């Protein structure tokens, strides 16, 4: 037997080991098979950084499969071996390099020399809020000790196995002081202040939105949207922002669970994700991927983005309003999924989180959240816009509203601070190093070096005017600013003449954002991200230039289009329009 590199799954402090999983219990898991012999390595960030922005080329889904997919021989060999061991093969995909398997616990133990056990672990406070208050603030999950082992027949063919650890890692986002006269805005109002293009035909664009809540213990979906709400919302928007999207629910099966939309129980998080992104990207298609927050759930989601089925369109932009502190994730086991998406030109946005510098981890240390901390992902922080003048000028502060009873941007009376800091998992990426960003200093004067710094950009966190279950609603958090920018860059792609495969695609967007002229950003210089619940925990402050509270700043849509038009000029066909 050979140990499978990277398969160990250490359990967080406070986790209790319970009993062994029943021998006959059916477990669904995913086997990841090596790329075909002779396949090139996926381009890394340094390679993307070295290619002039307008000269970058991206593959189609079919091109990706031909270039980077697994060989059919390897897929068949792995599937046949597992079938002979008594396991059931549910599906296989050479392009993705995946084999979906159903097996009894005893069969898994026999083949992989791993004992599956039940564990009880604490849920993050943010995750607890979405569950029945009568339930304990913990989860019971399946896991194992040590690492997975491979028999000789699978050694070198299998590079990872997902699904033998079912813990949750992730929670939704939304739940100093504000500028004068700060109040929640309608998305279209903020778009006008930010100079976003209005009325651009984004019908060629597809935005993917992750709905990762899963189901409750009764099998009811915990994250849903209501088509009638989406229609009503856009019927109430002004011209230039009132073209409704085509929303496509994508049901995913993870292990033995299938997740799908339940329109009878719409939720705020997902509803506003759809409405915010599509307000900016007029007429776009929005694919909503229903999954869960397990490791296997993330794999199912990101693989489906790359390999759409049936009439689904492949997204060129993805928005993720879920996060988990990155020390509890397994970077090289999941980061490759974002690296894959870069090859086909897909850009991914994710929240910085709403809990400040400690990212909701009460251990006295700063933490950042994954997937925003992944260097392939554009991480979005939060600001508050206020003091809006008739000229369109305004004041913008970093979002820092812990225990601020006078603020419209505080959740439950005390929560609400933008995330940001330095990853302990991912190294400083080339695009930050080449921009002179190699260290930051916290409130105690300590220098942080060597890690990936987040956020990359930042934006307004408080919107009103959404319609959920037929009623007007508002939402607060970096879960607002993230789909906002997903919509912007979809609209910019259309304004530049792009759309779909063969058009203008941005791919690994951070390698663009850090190269273009800094004049496209509004530098945020006021505010901090003190979490406020651990007095000894270090935090960071906004200042001139890049900082780990507001990143490069908030994005000026007009200036960004002008800068990108200059870069992509040989390819551009249309220029969009602006609403002042």
From Swiss-Prot:
The active site is at residues 269, 273, 479. Glycans are attached at residues 236, 529. Binds 1 Ca(2+) ion per subunit. Keywords: Calcium, Glycoprotein, Hydrolase, Metal-binding, Protease, Secreted, Serine protease, Signal, Virulence, Zymogen. One of its GO terms (cellular component) is extracellular region. Ca(2+) binds at residues 523-524, 543, 545, 547. GO terms for biological process: proteolysis. CDD domains: Peptidases_S53, Pro-peptidase_S53. Residues 181-567 form the Peptidase S53 domain. Residues 1-21 are annotated as: Disordered. InterPro entries: Peptidase_S8/S53_dom_sf (IPR036852), Peptidase_S8_Ser-AS (IPR023828), S53_propep (IPR015366), Sedolisin_dom (IPR030400), Tripeptidyl-peptidase_I (IPR050819). It catalyses: Release of an N-terminal tripeptide from a polypeptide. Its EC number is 3.4.14.10. It comes from the Eukaryota. Secreted tripeptidyl-peptidase which degrades proteins at acidic pHs and is involved in virulence. This is Tripeptidyl-peptidase sed5.
